[in-house]
Amino acid sequence: MRGRLRGPGATIAPSVLLEHMNKHLFPLLRLLADGSFHSGEQLGAALGLTRSAVWHAIRALEEQGLAPNKLRGRGYRLTRSVDLLVAADIAAACGASFRELKLEILDSCASTNTLLMEGARAGAAHGSVIACELQLAGRGRLGRQWQSGLAGGLTFSMLWRFDGGAAGLAGLSLAVGVAVARALERAGVAGVQLKWPNDILHGGRKLAGILIETGGEANGPGAAVIGIGINTRLDAAVREAIDQPVIDVAGLADPAPSRSALLGMVLDELVAVLTEFSRQGFAPFRDEWQRRHAHQNRRVSLLGAGKFAVEGDALGVAEDGALLLGSSDGVQRIISGDLSCNISLRDGA
């Protein structure tokens, strides 16, 4: 269940990276994934490549932080295992919910959200899911780039269609946060926190993020593309490139689940949450979200357009997902779409 980047998403600037990526990288990676030594001659025969082409593919692996061990007379062997996605394992972990989904696993792409937004406009089926081993231009909120490296995180998007349209999607990112938190707890990660409106934290460090893009009529049928990135096992180079404190599942769960198992659990929880959200909105998830609220009753500031906008006490969220901010002027309702929000503690906590 693997494919290549397709459609209009290939015209964006990061597609240049895809075009020049060594096309033999993933076939080579799968050959070496057994942990055994393979000679250059064996690799060339299996891949139909010259020794020179094998060398270039090896170099491509090194650029992804997967430099194989080379031993004269024996060949190449990966020094660490690579946790690639397996459709059958995802389906097993997802259970009965998997019947409602249509999963596609890509080796690499610019952005799963970009691909699925294009698919949504072209009539892609409800429940379509695109997951990717290596995302080259993953997007977060406010135009930030999501970084995880090859097989260092889960990067995937789901298309969910709603009869009620965009007007009924208030609080969707918070409900999705509840689904991700439930799945992480199933996977053995205790102490998951939620940050309004769309981050998953642990001990104040970012563990996962959500990006939702919508389309359709304000009061008619609509669709949401739900992009999720979860840090599963970040290498040192990726951590260094991220401009905020981060943590990964491998550092929190013992034993850590495979990426396939974790993806299956997240998809299962998403189907349950989105089905209920379609009927009742965010209200049924409000109390559960607030129990995990990272900044409940703390003094916070919200930043809009990169400068200080408003400060107050985070009192929780309303039934439509609005942040309730207490101040000397009373309680303000902050709607996710109104501000570019970056909640930061003001009391040193």
Regions found by a protein language model. Name each.
Residues 12-13, 17-50, 56-59, 63-64, ...:
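Long, positively charged amphipathic alpha-helical accessory segments at protein N-termini or as interdomain linkers
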Residues 17-186:
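N-terminal lobe of the biotin/lipoate ligase/transferase fold
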Residues 138, 199, 229:
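Active-site glycine-centered loops adjacent to acidic/histidine catalytic or metal-binding residues
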Residues 76, 199-200:
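Positions that flank functional sites
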